[in-house]
Amino acid sequence: MKKIIVFLALIVGILSFNNQSKEIEGMKLKWKEFLLNIPHDISLKEISKENKEKNIDKLNKSSKDILNKMRVYETQDYVFKDYQNMSSGNHILRSLKDIQTLIKAYLTPDTNVYKDKEVKEMINIGLEIISERGYVVGAMEKGNWWEWEIGIPKTLNEILIMGEEIIESEISSKLLKASYYFQPDPEFSGLSPAARTSTSPNKRVSKGGNRMDTALVTYGRGIIEKNASEIKRAINSVAVVGEYVEKGDGFYKDHSFIQHENVAYSGTYGQVLLNGLAQFIYLTGDTSFEINNPSIINIYDVIIKGYSYLLINGGINDSVNGRSISRDDSSDLGRAKPIINSLALISRGANSEYRSKIESIVKKAILDNNFEYMPDSVNNLVIANILNEIVKDKNIKPLDVRGTKVFSYMDRAVSIGKNGIKFAISMHSNRIANYETMNKENIRGWYTGDGMTYIYTNNSSDFVEYWYQL
């Protein structure tokens, strides 16, 4: 009898392992389709001729510029003439971003470099240089910790998922080992001995948007290595971001979001968190790895009862964008796009109780924007398809948002009237900073938390070129 039980348990274990292996492969293909904008018959069945040509034209231009900068046949010290310092996290990350774009062009049919043998060779040489001279086990973090522990390993995951068939296994192995070295645990930052020389040398619990990023690093490695335990480890580390906090970073019961301990940040850093969560929900949906932790429901509530007020005229109110308001390459409309994109992805994985309301928020944000039709400017075709589906679905009605919402924990208030007038008030207290400046950004934001009042008409372009001119 014992032998029969052991045999049955073994069979169940094998079947479970085989099923998980198929699910991991499915998640990888889904991610690959998302990254490449090439239909794999998952979320993208086909793409229009216009979108295809637009994607090819963009990749042709980018790949030409990138190849002109590459110096892999002239030196083994760096990859690009513009990023020669292989001890700089910034130069390594920029090099990887360019290689990532080159891989996209190489793998996209009808581009000028599609399946070009020399380009494939240059990609591998470039990654080998980085694996030996830049992102290496035993190296020290010089400069911004984020580049070494989040930016680089996240980009590496995407590169290795997209380029699994063209990147040499020895190079992949070295880069993954370096990723584990610099960011070993999804729950912590500053854990590597390399962090001692960075801008944030101390071990600390990874919170908010940073926790989503560190979890995605672990999740991506689990997908690449087909390691179910690593995938579960990443997913289990995500649940904490949905737990309401009473002080410091995170979401609050009144749907506020704080980052950097005392800055109202539902916008920029909230977007990072939502983006990471959206990827998890989208990629793990309909698998045994799906996120089912009850605390994630809190984030759905924050979206429906919080972001519905902060998304005004298709933009995100600037009182919750911290220092990013001073950047001359963005606006409230631009900063809202990744939030709306994330909500669209989240809606596809949310249960029916929340899905319809989130779709209604997305539809309202798109239709309220009379400056541009926002889906047309979305480069990711998976997301663009979802956005267009939501807009065209007559059963989805834009959410009717009216009344006053007080975000007491981040000292913000928003009021939306029946006549289309909206206003928001930005305050500060002993809990909340009056403004944030860092990295030479927002150095004149002195009074933006002193009761500053934002008054909106229905014109979405009112504040498009406002901040950076001050």
Predicted segments with their positions:
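Bacterial Sec-dependent signal peptides at the C-terminal "C-region" and cleavage site
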Residues: 12-22
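Positively charged n-region of N-terminal signal peptides that target proteins for export
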Residues: 1-4
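Aromatic-lined, polymer-binding surfaces characteristic
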Residues: 67-336
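Low-complexity, Ser/Thr/Pro/Gly-enriched N-terminal "stalk/linker" regions
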Residues: 20-93
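Generic structural signal of hydrophobic/aromatic residues within well-ordered alpha-helices
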Residues: 27, 31-35, 52-55, 59-66, ...
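Sec-dependent N-terminal signal peptides
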Residues: 6-10
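Non-membrane alpha-helical secondary structure
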Residues: 20-23, 27, 51, 55-58, ...
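Extended polysaccharide-engagement surfaces of secreted carbohydrate-active enzymes
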Residues: 280-295, 299-470
